[in-house]
Regions:
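Active-site catalytic microenvironments in core metabolic enzymes, especially phosphate/sugar-handling
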Residues: 1-167
Length: 167
C-alpha cells in the first residue's frame, strides 16, 4: 500500500501537475512557492480562450463529474488559470492567482466565504471537488510503479472515496 498527500501535491508530476496536464495547460509555472524549487498549485494558459461556462463544462468532463460548483459570471472570458488540487481555497492562493493575471482559479472545497472573497477580487472559481481533483493521480501512480517495478503487480483501488452526494 502506498499513501501520500501533501508531498504528492507539491511534487513535480504529482496531483497539481496531473490536473494541469489533464486540462492541457500551456506555459505552466508554480503557484505558491513552498521551498527553493517546490510549489503548491500551478498557473497556466488554456489552449484557447473559453467562457467560464465553457471551462466549467470542460473541467466537468475531464474530471468525470456529474456536477460542479462555480463562482463568477458565466460569460467571463478565461485564458489564464490558477489551480490547486484538494482544498486549495486559501485566500492567499486565490490572491496569488489574481496577481498573476489569472481570470479563473480551479480547486476543491469551495465554501461560501471563499466564493465571496473571489468575487471581491474579481476572480472566477471552479470547484472540481477535493476528491476528484486528487483522485486523478491514482492511474498515473499505478503506471509509474508498473514502469519502475515491472515484476510487481500494481492494482489501483476502485473504491470511490467521494463522501458527498447530491440528490
Amino acid at each position: 500500500i502506498y499513501s501520500a498527500h501533501t508531498n504528492l501535491d507539491i511534487a513535480e508530476g504529482g496531483t497539481n501537475s496531473t490536473l494541469s496536464n489533464l486540462l492541457e495547460l500551456n506555459n505552466v509555472t508554480g503557484l505558491f512557492q513552498t521551498g527553493e524549487t517546490s510549489f503548491l498549485g500551478k498557473i497556466g494558459y488554456l489552449k484557447q480562450e473559453m467562457t467560464l461556462n465553457e471551462l466549467a463544462n470542460f473541467v466537468k468532463e475531464k474530471l468525470n463529474l456529474n456536477h460542479l460548483v462555480i463562482s463568477g459570471n458565466k460569460s467571463t472570458k478565461i485564458k489564464k488559470v490558477g489551480l490547486c488540487t484538494g482544498k486549495g481555497t486559501d485566500a492567499d492562493f486565490m490572491q496569488i492567482a489574481k496577481n498573476n493575471d489569472c481570470q479563473c482559479y480551479i480547486t476543491g472545497g469551495l465554501g461560501y466565504h471563499d466564493a465571496q472573497y473571489a468575487q471581491d477580487i474579481g476572480l472566477c472559481v471552479i470547484d472540481g471537488t477535493h476528491y476528484f481533483t486528487e483522485v486523478i493521480i491514482v492511474p498515473v501512480l499505478c503506471e509509474y510503479i508498473k514502469n519502475k517495478i515491472p515484476n510487481v503487480e500494481c492494482v489501483c483501488s476502485k473504491i470511490n472515496g467521494q463522501t458527498l452526494d447530491i440528490l
